[in-house]
Amino acid sequence: ICKRNLDIERPSYTNLNRLISQVVSSITASLRFDGALNVDLTEFQTNLVPYPRIHFPLVTYAPIISAEKAYHEQLAVAEVTSACFEPANQMVKCDPRHGKYMACCMLYRGDVVPKDVNAAIATIKTKRSIQFVDWCPTGFKVGINYQPPTVVLGGDLAKVQRAVCMLSNTTAVAEAWARLDHKFDLMYAKRAFVHWYVGEGMEEGEFSEAREDLAALEKDYEEVGLDTFEAEEEEGGDEY
């Protein structure tokens, strides 16, 4: 994101932290400022977590515009909302088009009115590329905060009038677990760095246990994404 959107050749931890801080600021804004629809942190858990194990939200933030390329025309609510469903604006590398959404939490900041938000979400629901699971209603939790995003003076990000941070629970995040598993398997096959952990008091069995747990988590996400509605129809046949 830093390279593509902000034209930073070699992003440092400062660049990354400034981007992450915008996300954290958006999530906690409702605790600090007034808005039309304030969202409590406990509401995230209620709305985003359908099962205890499926509790890893995918975070997306828009717009991410460099200070040098700051638009004179501000992006509309519909545009920033649509940008939240683009893989390019995600904080975790995975393709939501290959998965299904279980729930979405949209946190708007700045010059935003509920009417525009409702229209933008209605448009999103009509898009074929954005799929929701069929065993729960297509829930969009919305938070609107009147405080516009604040940026660090002389920083990489442009000052914008409105922004949105989306927390979504999608089965596509399992791609991140698969990547992690693959990297672990390559290193663990050679027992790379294991001696350091064992030397500090860990047991080798803990690595195998953690690997099995992550494999089970991948399976859980896979099962959640299955078309339960279709499966029930096939089982039931023509019975009413």
Curated annotation (Swiss-Prot):
Subunit structure: Dimer of alpha and beta chains. A typical microtubule is a hollow water-filled tube with an outer diameter of 25 nm and an inner diameter of 15 nM. Alpha-beta heterodimers associate head-to-tail to form protofilaments running lengthwise along the microtubule wall with the beta-tubulin subunit facing the microtubule plus end conferring a structural polarity. Microtubules usually have 13 protofilaments but different protofilament numbers can be found in some organisms and specialized cells.
Primary residence: cytoplasm
SMART domains according to UniProt: Tubulin_C
Gene Ontology CC, one term: microtubule
GO biological process: microtubule-based process
EC numbers on record: 3.6.5.-
Pfam family of the protein (one): Tubulin_C
Signal peptide: none
PTM annotation: Undergoes a tyrosination/detyrosination cycle, the cyclic removal and re-addition of a C-terminal tyrosine residue by the enzymes tubulin tyrosine carboxypeptidase (TTCP) and tubulin tyrosine ligase (TTL), respectively.
Name this polypeptide is given: Tubulin alpha chain
Molecular function terms from GO: GTP binding; hydrolase activity; structural constituent of cytoskeleton
